[in-house]
Swiss-Prot record:
Organism, scientific name: Rhizobium etli (strain CIAT 652)
Gene encoding the protein: mutL
PANTHER family listed in its UniProt record: DNA MISMATCH REPAIR PROTEIN MLH, PMS, MUTL (PTHR10073), DNA MISMATCH REPAIR PROTEIN MLH1 (PTHR10073:SF12)
Keyword presence, Secreted: no
Name this protein carries in UniProt: DNA mismatch repair protein MutL
Cellular component terms per the entry's GO annotation: mismatch repair complex
Keywords for this protein: DNA damage, DNA repair
InterPro entries in UniProt: DNA_mismatch_repair_CS (IPR014762), DNA_mismatch_repair_MutL (IPR020667), DNA_mismatch_S5_2-like (IPR013507), HATPase_C_sf (IPR036890), MutL/Mlh/PMS (IPR002099), MutL/Mlh/Pms-like (IPR038973), MutL_C (IPR014790), MutL_C_dimsub (IPR042120)
GO molecular function, one term: ATP-dependent DNA damage sensor activity
Region Disordered: start-end pairs: 348-378
């Protein structure tokens, strides 16, 4: 068969298969054109999920009649001329409008601000129907009807109208985040009107519009520069996380991207603070010289290629970790909100257990005896971590049953987490702050403190160990024993000394001194499982912090152990100065805060 030149219409339809995958793809291209034209107001209207109608109106610079005719021709553009090295616009290929016109009925009406009148062009299935004068306001209105009517096979691959409308909404949200100075309005027969008023340079206000006030309340500012590459944006505290990565937004020179390198860097930055299967919420904006990034590697321009990907990844990971450390004692505000909803009239819990009748024996005001298996003696590991200065300043609270003195402004206002007032169910510390109260999960909080202390020691020197008077003997499968012994030298750096004790057994002779009393059996078994899962032949050097987190969990104050008042206060003081203390090593919150105004509202006093 002879080789022949394809028709212009067929060429455009082939290009449309790459550029215009669905109605949301067309919406993205048209919104980008409006932004490149300098629009400050963009309105999007849809019907039938964008298949029946997609209209994008803007107040941008507009076009003359000659520009309209060129705009629907392939590879005609005003945005680049001779090189791809300095792309500063969202669009640049000149493919979007001819691709849309080849598979749909396209109508464009436009008028320049300095023109007395406007013009319109109509295209159907790749053929120009007419070009004529038309009444138009300054700016451009692009109307797409019957998308894919010229290639009906493509319609079979589209999702439901609701799903397609949702994809368009997501595109508008991403554009709204990237351009807070632009007003966006999305309306149509298949949705309620969505409006994002312009917020100027107030990016956080736009985040609140798009992502909700909860994100604004749980966001940490990012602002970092490395070798002329700048990173700005907001990262959510670790306890403010989601079940998928859909709430991670990345922009490169203002262009929304879904780049694997950036998403991987976000995961890496939160690796030690978020539970498996949960995802952080983040909005990142990277600004760099256009010559240092290639945006022409994907038909939809959703992926980019950095000249120095390692530098970009390091910038993202470092900036997020530094921000989390700087503001690390914060926990998400959502926990308190959920708890408050439980007290409001009409709230129905998922499962309500019958309550036992009240009696003096079960009264919550009765002093708790020591929990089974625990003594009243403080745990050694806690004393080693407590700050001497904090312990010297704080006076012990009265014994149970004694009158409780009123908290002074000096006591509650001096410390963000307040002063300990009680311990409930031998697990939760209740502290009074200047404007409310804080409830702390003692095990989760102490686990984080131990981990941070171990991590700090790891970076400075070998961890001190304590010799066990009687070694702990743990029976394990032979393969687990072999794996552990392969990494015995590295575990000794963490203060854990082990050796073989015959076939199928490990002897633990030393444990990290800062952990105090350790559940050696549980620790060794979990380490064996983790090493088997990692299956690392190159050693544990890259995983030592994960091992430290496991040790911290097994060496922390346990749930069910009573703490003395000075121990509780020392724990609060240590949390205030420890990075990341707002969440445990598994990403769960270590405390929740209730403002006095919220409590008063529950009792109708607001």
């Amino acid at each position: 068969m002879a080789i022949r030149q394809l028709s212009e219409t067929l060429i455009n339809q082939i290009a449309a298969g790459e550029v215009i995958e669905r109605p949301a793809s067309a919406a993205k291209e048209l919104i980008e054109n409006a932004l490149d034209a300098g629009a400050t107001r963009i309105e999007i209207a849809t019907a039938g999920g964008g298949k029946a109608l997609l209209r994008v109106s803007d107040n941008g610079s507009g076009m003359e009649a000659t520009d309209l005719e060129l705009a629907v021709r392939r590879h005609c553009t005003s945005k680049i001329s001779e090189t791809l090295e300095d792309i500063r616009t969202l669009g640049f290929r000149g493919e979007a409008l001819p691709s849309i016109g080849s598979v749909a009925r396209l109508n464009i009406a436009s008028r320049r601000r300095d023109s007395a009148g406007g013009h319109e062009i109509a295209v159907a299935g790749g053929k120009i129907v007419h070009i004529r004068p038309a009444a138009a306001n300054p700016g451009t209105i692009v109307e797409v009807r019957d998308l894919f009517f010229a290639t009906p096979a493509r319609l079979k691959f589209l999702k439901s109208e609701k799903a397609e409308a949702g994809a368009i909404t997501e595109i508008v949200k991403r554009m709204a985040i990237a351009f807070p100075a632009v007003r966006f309005v999305l309306s149509g027969s298949d949705r309620t009107t969505l409006e994002f008023p312009a917020t100027g340079d107030d990016h956080l206000a736009r985040m609140a519009q798009v992502l909700g006030k909860e994100f604004r309340d749980n966001a940490i500012l990012l602002d970092a520069v490395r070798e002329d590459i700048s990173l700005t944006g907001f990262a959510g505290v670790p306890t403010f996380n989601r079940g998928n990565s859909a709430h991670q937004y990345a922009f490169v020179n203002g262009r929304p991207v879904q780049d694997k390198l950036i998403l991987s860097a976000i995961r890496g930055a939160y690796a030690e603070t978020i539970p498996s299967g949960r995802y952080p919420v983040a909005v990142l904006s990277i600004t760099l010289d256009p010559a240092l990034v290639d945006v022409n590697v994907h038909p939809a321009k959703s992926d980019v290629r950095f000249r120095d990907p390692g530098l970009v990844r390091g910038l993202i990971v470092g900036a997020i970790r530094e921000a989390l450390a700087r503001d690390g004692s914060r926990a998400a505000t959502t926990g308190a909100s959920d708890m408050l909803r439980a007290f409001r009239p009409g709230f129905q819990p998922h499962a309500q257990r019958p309550q036992a009748p009240w009696s003096a024996e079960t009264s919550p005001f009765r002093p708790y005896p020591p929990a089974a298996g625990f003594s009243e003696r403080p745990q050694a590991s806690f004393d080693r971590l407590s700050m001497p200065t904090a312990r010297a300043e704080l006076q012990p609270s009265p014994q149970p049953g004694a009158p409780e003195p009123a908290a002074s402004a000096e006591t509650t206002g001096r410390y963000p987490l307040g002063a300990a007032r009680a311990q409930i169910h031998a697990n939760y510390i209740v502290a009074q702050t200047e404007d409310g109260l804080v409830i702390v999960d003692q095990h989760a909080a102490h686990e984080r403190l131990v981990f941070e202390a171990m991590r700090k020691a790891l970076h400075s020197k070998r961890l001190a160990s304590q010799v066990l008077l009687i070694p702990e003997i743990i029976d394990l499968p032979e393969e687990d024993c072999d794996r552990l012994m392969q990494h015995a030298a590295e575990l000794s750096e963490l203060g854990l000394a082990i050796e073989r004790f015959g076939p199928g057994a490990i002897a633990v002779r030393e444990t990290p001194a800062m952990l105090g009393e350790v559940d050696a059996h549980g620790l060794i078994r979990q380490l064996a499982d983790e090493i088997a899962e990692w299956d690392t032949a190159s050693g544990l050097s890259a995983k030592l912090e994960y091992v430290a987190a496991t040790m911290a969990c097994h060496g922390s104050v346990r749930s069910g152990r009573r703490l003395r008042p000075e121990e509780m206060n020392a724990l609060l003081r240590e949390m205030e100065v420890t990075p990341g203390s707002g969440q445990c090593n598994h990403g769960r919150p270590t405390y929740i805060e209730l403002k006095l105004s919220d409590i008063e509202r529950l009792f109708g006093r607001s």
